[in-house]
Amino acid sequence: MFDTKRLTTLPDAPGVYLMKGNGGDILYVGKAKSLRKRVRSYFSKGGESRYHIRFLVGRVADIDVIVTDTEKEALLLENTLIKEHRPRYNLDLRDDKTYFSLRLDMNEEFPRLTIVRRPGRDGARYFGPYSSASAAREVLKQLYKLFPLRHYPLESCRRRRRPCLFYQLRQCAAPCHGLISGEDYQSLAEGAALFLAGKNSDLTRLYRQRMAAAAADERYEDAARYRDLIRAIEVTVEKQKMVAGDGDTDVVGFFRDATDLSVSILFYRGGRLMGSRNYLLDWEMDDAEGLSSFLSGYYNRDVVIPDEILIPFTVDDTDPLGELLTERRGKKTVLRHPVRGTKAELVRLAARNAEAYLHEKREKDSGMEQVLGELKEKLHLTNLPRRIECYDISTIQGRYSVGSRVRFQNGAPDKAGYRRYRIRTVPGTDDFAMMHEVLSRRFRDGHGGDGRPDLIVIDGGMGQLNVLTAILEELGLHGIDAVSLAKSRVERNMSDNEVVRSDERVFLPGRRNPVVLRQNGAPLLLLARIRDEAHRFAITYHQKLRGKGSIRSSLEGIPGIGEKRKRELLKRFGSIRALRQADREQLAAVPSVSPALADAIWKALHGEEPEAP
């Protein structure tokens, strides 16, 4: 129990407080404009009827405070400490989707658009977010018809003897082959940036000016090109409705019922709705502190920061958060709580989205709860398998051997729990020993600092399962369920040319005969999906290592090629195919590769006996 006499000694200054349990574990990290007032509010006599105060008073044994000079410093420190300690009762900002952005670096030679998972802090411009890679690719596909920017890395383009197919389709201006001037290409890139930012009126105004200038200079082909661009842009955007001005705005909606809290963010770019992002939050504090913690955590990650953030109610740290985001973005960002007008309607719309997401998620989870309950019953599990981990091994004749781990939480992939393991200690093709190494590395300190799964699934039969159970016993990890999933087998009866496929089987510890689940039932489909995902994850890593190794093996025996030059060639060309396509001049362009050595490399890659350079 926390000694409330300490409350009078707390400083009346901005800073961060860390609430700790009996074992010294950090339960919650918060920030405050005044540490004394904020922490005292949790223990005030008039507040004990509120759940979050009863919750804290009952569990907090000690509170540490760190004083900062400003609220903005407190905000930064809070985020750092949350990332470091991951307290049980702070928000965990995970959603069930991966989002993508388009990246455009105007400082590149001939700027190119690429799809990235996370915006970086590298001076490039980022547009989005998009809910899937396919959505981002569709935007690119349509964009290239208006703005034919290059599709491939410059090194790849310049190795080609002629422009790529996209040039023939008029979806690439082929700058790498000198078919467009640098000035005109830069104009295309600037136009693409304006279009993606929703600045269509600015873009058409700019192109009208250039069309008029080209016509005045009797450059009629250029004038016609600008005319066609203006028409195409107007046709593209004429059906889009502008509802949020012409800037970039994030609208935050907030919904709470008796048991759950959800947040929805609507992304408006150039005044048009581009997409949304939803979160279901495990939060036991009051709404204002919940929203404050959410905003702080979300916008201190690698996300696109807009001009304006609309929020459903005011929070204490609106001003310092706005200052911090302005500093990170390099442009002014403001947080507003609109109470009337169009922007207030947008906030209410976001709240309705948050409510709809909560009901949809709850309905989906209830269905998955039934599937997990059926798995527990059919496989005689100790635990309801909310967190399932699956392991797989990938190797070819003992070379480039790797292991993988995937994690599913409540029936959905939890990408933060995916891990790859390069096999270090096992020579040859001993799959059992490789699995032993992977599992030992995972659980070497009891739970690997990554929490305990309810159920472990491995691909294979009774042999693989025996390895797993032996490791769990060896490490003293009791109470974790384990099963192995054996793929169906195909058998051919040669006499009547009949093909028979056996059922997939689940092996359990201490039981000789496997359990056969209904083949199209949801429990087996879930296990098979997890098993296949672990296999995909392992084989992707294996192929990556094998691709790197193929370059190295192709260069073995060439005089003058050591590990350093192998790394440089691998970095420059990326694959053995690209390396073989390179001519002598391109090979000699690699640092530390002389013309004579380039000739030796080229001969070795094309089946000729290399000579000492």
Curated annotation (Swiss-Prot):
It is found in: Cytoplasm. Pfam families: GIY-YIG, HHH_5, UVR, UvrC_RNaseH, UvrC_RNaseH_dom. Its main location: cytoplasm. Residues 201-236 form the UVR domain. The keyword Transcription does not apply. It comes from the Bacteria. Keywords: Cytoplasm, DNA damage, DNA excision, DNA repair, Excision nuclease, SOS response. GO terms for biological process: DNA damage response; nucleotide-excision repair; SOS response. One of its GO terms (molecular function) is excinuclease ABC activity. The keyword rRNA processing does not apply. Disulfide bonds: none annotated. Belongs to the UvrC family. This is UvrABC system protein C. It comes from Geobacter sulfurreducens (strain ATCC 51573 / DSM 12127 / PCA).
